[in-house]
């Protein structure tokens, strides 16, 4: 293992192997402890995309909220559907919601807000690329979730995990923003393992991962965008050897996107080289 890989493995907290029952108990306990230590929290808010990550986090949150209510703590899980117009995989979103069984479902179509933002910028002389418009979608989705959380005395739960965090494969202040990130410390295959253990439909954790933010490239697979497979990323995070080419791609993503893992730099915290 290279020196940088060792540093990254320590930072990303991924275990070489997990016991599903123990891991789920630990994840639920983290969520419950956070709620119990912040008496203002009356709701937990999460956007549901129909993908592996939000399905897993949604199920964990609902299980945690159920237990909290049994313990006398009043709180609600609000699952949010955030389509941009008509969502291509809307059936999988509904399948995920049936599996999660959330207390409440809110639907907000982000298309009018995103399109208006893009148009307003265009009128100001700022013409966004399709990729940049994709980031607008991600930020609008998170803005909506925080608005709901503010209205309902809640917090926003994130879906960031270590295979995503290492690559910076999320929008800064978009899907990378949240109050808590329960599944950080898991890689992609471990997330699949937990969903299988929880009895999720295979379609939800065996589907090809995609951020699906670009109009010009609908359902673009994450692995195509990253230039490396999740299998390689997971192996790297577990301290296993990967090919020199895979190592270079992974470490380049890690270094280039370091700013996404930090709060806004100050003159005291900027890591000058």
From Swiss-Prot:
Binding positions for deamido-NAD(+) per the UniProt entry: 139, 172, 179, 259-260
Record PANTHER family: NH 3 /GLUTAMINE-DEPENDENT NAD + SYNTHETASE, NH(3)-DEPENDENT NAD(+) SYNTHETASE
Pfam families linked to this entry: NAD_synthase
Top-level taxon in the UniProt lineage: Bacteria
NADP as UniProt keyword: no
Positions that bind ATP: 47-54, 159, 188, 210
Functional summary from the UniProt entry: Catalyzes the ATP-dependent amidation of deamido-NAD to form NAD. Uses ammonia as a nitrogen source.
One GO cellular component term noted in the UniProt record for this chain: cytoplasm
Assembly behavior: Homodimer.
Record-linked InterPro entries: NAD/GMP_synthase (IPR022310), NAD_synthase (IPR003694), NH(3)-dep_NAD(+)_synth (IPR022926), Rossmann-like_a/b/a_fold (IPR014729)
Positions contributing to Mg(2+) binding: 53, 164
Keywords linked to the UniProt accession: ATP-binding, Ligase, Magnesium, Metal-binding, NAD, Nucleotide-binding
Catalytic activity: deamido-NAD(+) + NH4(+) + ATP = AMP + diphosphate + NAD(+) + H(+)
Species of the source: Staphylococcus aureus (strain bovine RF122 / ET3-1)
Protein name: NH(3)-dependent NAD(+) synthetase
GO molecular function annotations of the record: ATP binding; glutaminase activity; metal ion binding; NAD+ synthase (glutamine-hydrolyzing) activity; NAD+ synthase activity
Claim: Glycosyltransferase is one of the keywords in the record: no
């Amino acid at each position: 293992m290279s020196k940088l890989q060792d540093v990254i493995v320590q930072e990303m907290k991924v275990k070489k192997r997990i016991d599903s029952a123990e891991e789920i108990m630990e994840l639920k306990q983290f969520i419950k402890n956070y709620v119990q230590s912040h008496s203002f929290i009356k709701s937990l808010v999460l956007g549901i995309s129909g993908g592996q990550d939000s399905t897993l986090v949604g199920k964990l949150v609902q299980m945690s909220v159920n237990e909290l209510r049994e313990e006398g703590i009043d709180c609600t899980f609000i699952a949010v559907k955030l389509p941009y117009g008509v969502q291509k995989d809307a059936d999988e979103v509904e399948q995920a919601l049936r599996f999660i069984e959330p207390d409440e479902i809110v639907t907000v179509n982000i298309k009018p807000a995103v399109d208006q933002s893009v148009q307003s910028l265009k009128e100001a002389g700022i013409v966004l690329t399709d990729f940049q418009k994709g980031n607008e979608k991600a930020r609008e989705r998170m803005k909506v979730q925080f608005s709901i959380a503010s209205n309902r005395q809640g917090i926003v739960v994130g879906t960031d995990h270590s295979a995503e965090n290492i690559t910076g494969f999320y929008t800064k202040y978009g899907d990378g923003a949240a109050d808590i990130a329960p599944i950080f410390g898991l890689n992609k295959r471990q997330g699949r393992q937990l969903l299988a253990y929880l009895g999720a439909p295979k379609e939800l954790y065996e589907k090809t991962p995609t951020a699906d933010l670009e109009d010009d490239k609908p359902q673009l697979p994450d692995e195509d965008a990253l230039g490396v497979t999740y299998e390689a990323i997971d192996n790297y995070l577990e301290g296993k050897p990967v090919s020199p080419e895979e190592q270079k791609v992974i470490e380049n993503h890690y270094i280039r996107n370091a700013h996404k893992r930090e709060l806004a730099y100050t003159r005291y915290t900027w890591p000058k080289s």
